[in-house]
Amino acid sequence: AVFGEPGGKFEWVMTGRHLTIRADGNSVENTAFGGPIFYGHAVEANEKPDHPGNVWWPQARLANEIFQSLDGKQREKALLEGTPPDSDETVRLRGNASGIQGLPGSALTRDQRDLLKKTLKSMLSMYRESDVEEAVGCLDAHGGYEELRLSFYKEGDLGSDGIWDRWRVEG
């Protein structure tokens, strides 16, 4: 769907059960893409632990590198019970990180924060460079990587291998 007028303030949104991607013409002030992005991919009805053919699995592997680098106290904050609900609330902007569960970026070491940057760079790699620059600019204007929250969810750990299949970066 296209909202607004291309050439002016506009937003293009494609959404479905496991997908919300966006491109915008600065339709919402201080908000990259006009709102949150969300994606998942299930190649098969019953995914295998290594997710063969899943286009987003390389990003999950990067996120799991962050988890593996965490110490015990950090893991306690980052690893949450359950899983996020499948609802409209899942993909709404929620403002600053207060009230968002997970490990704050401010609790990461420099090396861990570099892994977070690498993960986010991969997550944004399919977007235009101008959109990526806007996203990073918005992030910097709101406190940077230190203000993000990183969450991994116990439910849905395929293979019970401690490689977290469901995770989020928010803030």
Residue ranges and their predicted role:
Residues 1-102:
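Acidic/His-rich structured neighborhood in mature extracellular/periplasmic domains
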Residues 6, 12-14, 18-21, 148-171:
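Long, His/Glu/Asp-enriched segments that create or flank divalent metal/ion-associated functional microenvironments
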Residues 17, 22, 61, 75, ...:
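Arginine residue identity/basic-tract feature
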Residues 24, 50, 71, 86-88, ...:
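Acidic-enriched, low-complexity/disordered segments with a strong bias for Aspartate over Glutamate
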Residues 27, 69, 87, 98, ...:
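Generic serine detector
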Residues 34-36, 78-80, 107-147:
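Extended intrinsically disordered, low-complexity coil regions enriched in Ser, Thr, Gly, Ala
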Residues 90-96, 127, 131-165:
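Accessory structured domains or lobes within enzymes
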